[in-house]
Amino acid sequence: MRKTDRHPVSGANSLWHVYQTVPFLKVVKNFIVIQIARYTPFIGMKNWLYRTFLRMKVGKQTSFALMVMPDIMFPEKISVGTNTIIGYNTTILAHEYLIHEYRIGKVLIGDEVMIGANTTILPGVKIGDGAVVSAGTLVHKDVPDGAFVGGNPMRIIYTKEEMQERLKKSAE
């Protein structure tokens, strides 16, 4: 189950009320910073931009590939551990606007996690240390430490123990 805070709205849908939930100038600033970071090939610069201007928590030696799209409204709710790779064109959401409510949730990505290209991570999930997320996955629930997951809907392909056994066999 994803951990999100629910905020009901009345009248028009929640996205119609967007600037009552997040300041307009914050969105403009975040948009500009994210667009610069999406296209720059300099990983150190991306991490600096994310930490400095978006207030994201980004661990040492973490790499964001080209075109990664962190949440534009609430990037400060995203935390990425050390020595993690976020694959090309991955989207990390910390919010979702629905018809009668909007939801906000932290996204916690552990240490030494590998996230494949074109993955979408929904708000309120935790991806455990050492996990591997296959390309094109919709991460809609927590991922256990060391697990290999993939698909839409996401499912566990190998547990941490099964992954260790596979690595052991391939080394023989």
Curated annotation (Swiss-Prot):
One of its GO terms (molecular function) is acyltransferase activity. The keyword Repeat applies. Keywords: Acyltransferase, Repeat, Transferase. It comes from the Bacteria. The keyword Repressor does not apply. Its EC number is 2.3.1.-. Pfam families: Hexapep (PF00132). Belongs to the transferase hexapeptide repeat family. PANTHER family: ACETYLTRANSFERASE, ACETYLTRANSFERASE YVOF-RELATED. This is Putative acetyltransferase YvoF. It comes from Bacillus subtilis (strain 168).
